[in-house]
């Protein structure tokens, strides 16, 4: 068995024993790609092997699954937090929500907000959570993005009762399009795009709308074969004089010949977002459809489409978009930064992508609490990143090992220094302690060392007091005891003999005054005490008098916040 297959099998076993003996292919793929990001471009190829692995594990008795796995994974704790406001029209046990991301990019904080709100209301009232990939734009969708979304949601701790794709229902969506044409509530338009836009601005009816019914049905058939992309679209027969521009005969179907990542070239006529989301929400049994405020004007069209088709209409609710100042969520902004080499990838800690925030050390629990604290307001504001940091600080403080980090290190030789120091790993005392061999020579922070003078005193944190005997190029001192009441200036330190050199990446907002800030990623090179090597990769650390960081590797940490 290959390493990849072995890892996938372990993830599948963990998923199975956590869900009554039944593993899910999507969850296994998400877990594998989360652990091995380099495999994302091969997500499509991996699915076949994962399907076989999952089928085999699901055929095993649960006792055998547990036996092979060994230790059963601990279930994630539900995060506590403020409650969202009551949900209008909610019936206990019958709330159905959906999160419908388009697999055309990596998920970000805005996706997290939508997903969490949908999940929280089902948790509050009971019901069904649906994950539905809104994948009806074949040229933009990629298997890599389907996988990235699932990885992000899994990291957030969100699980779904139903997972599907809008493209699963293409035959139904096309039949509903034909139904609208047959009832006269839609028509086929062959106008050029510029002419369509001009008529909509002028509130002038399209000449195509006046054609005979049989012409529209013939045009619909030609859209599936003879017409080329851009030569024809199917439009909703709305109201060209409406003050709501969305209702001025919007496009419902268009021709696109790009291969779809799941369906290949099976279809060339694809529904617009407005057509697809309305039909899907209705047939999926959604009771409350949440979407961001930017879609508010489209609610009238949403209801009109379902009304013409005599289909059930869910309640639609809006919330404001979530963005941070200087931290773009738009693909139109992020992609050029990556393509131009200004930002290496979507997991850059300067970005508000889920991968970027994970790398920075922001926790899923902090994101959830932050989102809930914002409520359902529709007022568009740029949220302060500091507010998220405050929630994160509460999340990570209790399990962040305290360590010393010395930037721009200056050596000092100290006579009479105790050979070892025992320091608590956390002020609470709940995380044990560590011993450091001092060796008689230490590194001090260069900035602090600049202010030292002969005859002065400093207190080495957790070690004792030192008199400065030489403050020139070569620092030297003498240990004078451990009198904390003396009130000497405190300094962190690391032993010269066992100190480890690391880089600390310091992310800042990448956009300043509308332009990319080339200085937005700072680097601090310093020396850290040897216990750093014992901390697991991905764990949170608080470097004393510096801030919280996430350990990326034995040689690098990422600054989270102060």
Curated annotation (Swiss-Prot):
The keyword Isomerase does not apply. It is an enzyme of class 6 (ligase). It catalyses: tRNA(Glu) + L-glutamate + ATP = L-glutamyl-tRNA(Glu) + AMP + diphosphate. GO terms for molecular function: ATP binding; glutamate-tRNA ligase activity. InterPro entries: aa-tRNA-synth_I_CS (IPR001412), Gln/Glu-tRNA_Ligase (IPR050132), Glu-tRNA-synth_arc/euk (IPR004526), Glu/Gln-tRNA-synth (IPR000924), Glu/Gln-tRNA-synth_Ib_cat-dom (IPR020058), Glu/Gln-tRNA-synth_Ib_codon-bd (IPR020059), Rbsml_bL25/Gln-tRNA_synth_N (IPR020056), Ribosomal_bL25/Gln-tRNA_synth (IPR011035). Pfam families: tRNA-synt_1c, tRNA-synt_1c_C. Gene3D superfamilies: 2.40.240.100, HUPs (3.40.50.620), Ribosomal Protein L25, Chain P (2.40.240.10). Its main location: cytoplasm. The keyword ATP-binding applies. Keywords: Aminoacyl-tRNA synthetase, ATP-binding, Cytoplasm, Ligase, Nucleotide-binding, Protein biosynthesis. SUPFAM superfamilies: Nucleotidylyl transferase, Ribosomal protein L25-like. One of its GO terms (cellular component) is protein-containing complex. GO terms for biological process: amide biosynthetic process; glutamyl-tRNA aminoacylation. It comes from the Archaea. Its EC number is 6.1.1.17. A motif ('HIGH' region) lies at residues 101-111. PANTHER family: GLUTAMATE--TRNA LIGASE, GLUTAMINE-TRNA LIGASE. Belongs to the class-I aminoacyl-tRNA synthetase family. Glutamate--tRNA ligase type 2 subfamily. Catalyzes the attachment of glutamate to tRNA(Glu) in a two-step reaction: glutamate is first activated by ATP to form Glu-AMP and then transferred to the acceptor end of tRNA(Glu). This is Glutamate--tRNA ligase. It comes from Cenarchaeum symbiosum (strain A). The gene is gltX.
